[in-house]
Amino acid sequence: MLWYHLHIFGNNILFSGLYENQEDRQTIRVIEKNGIRFSLLAYTFGVNETTNYKSIQKQLKTYPYILGQLNKEQIKEDVNNAKAQSDVVIVAVHWGKEGHSELSDLQQEYAHYFADLGVDVVIGNHPHLIQPIEKINHTLVIYSLGNFLSTMKDVYNQLEGMVCFDFVKKEDEISIENIQYVPLVNHYNDNVVTIYSLKEYTSTLASQHSILKDQADIIKEFKNYVKQMISNDDIDIEMWGLYEEKNKSININNLYGWWYCFFLS
C-alpha cells in the first residue's frame, strides 16, 4: 500500500514524508516560485492503529526510511540540508491529540524545536479540530487546520481553516506578511461533501447538514470559536469574514494552505 501511494501521482505532485528508499529519504523536496526556493519537509508522530497497523509497524522496522518520523536528530539533519538548498523551509507535521483543541506537550516541544532550527513555517494536523496560530521567534506555527473533506460525526469536526500569507523577499531577507485566516465549513449530506467559507455559509445550508441540522445557532458558535482559537495579539491575522470592517476581496480558489498541500502562487 505504501508503494502504491508513492507512485499513484507520478511526477505531477511534489510531496514529502513518504519515501521509496534511503536515497529518496535523503533527497530534500525543493520547488522554486517567483525567484524563491522552498523546501518541503514532513513528519509524523506515528501511524494510526488501523486494521493493518501491525503490517505498517513491521514495514517501519524493516524499512525505517519509508516514513518521516519525529526524530530530533533526523529533523536537524533534514532542516540543515534544506536551508542549504533553499530560501524558505516549510514543515508539515502530523501531531497532537485527536479531538482536542488544546495543544499537547509534544506539539509545543516540537514547535519550539522547529523554531530553534530556523524553520520558517510549520503547518500541523491530526487533531481534526482547528488549533491556535502563533509565532515562535520568526517561525509561523499553525498547529492544526482541522479537516478538509470529511464525514466525521462531531459538530466541531465540520469547522476548519485555510491560511493565506505572502513570502516577501527583500535583498537577502524573506519575511512572512499579510497573514489571513479563512474559516471553512465541511458541509455534507448523504455523504456528498462540499466546502464553504464560513462567511458564505447560511442557516439554510446548516439545516441540510447531516450533523449541524439540529444546531440552531451553529454559525454564530463557529464564528465565536474561531475568534477565541485563532486571535493572537502578537500576530496581525486578518480573520476573513468575521469582522466586516476588515473584509477584503479574496479569491478563495487562490488561497495558500491546507495540511500537507502547498499552493505557491
Question: Which residue ranges define each predicted feature?
Answer:
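Intrinsically disordered, low-complexity segments enriched in serine/threonine/proline/glycine
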Residues: K246, F262-L264
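Acidic, low-complexity intrinsically disordered regions
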Residues: D236, N254-L255
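Acidic, metal/ion-coordinating pockets
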Residues: M1-N247
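Intrinsic disorder/low-complexity segments enriched in polar/charged and small flexible residues
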Residues: L242, Y260-C261
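Targeting/processing segments of secretory and organellar proteins
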Residues: K248-N253, W259
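Tryptophan (W) side chains
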Residues: W3, W258-W259
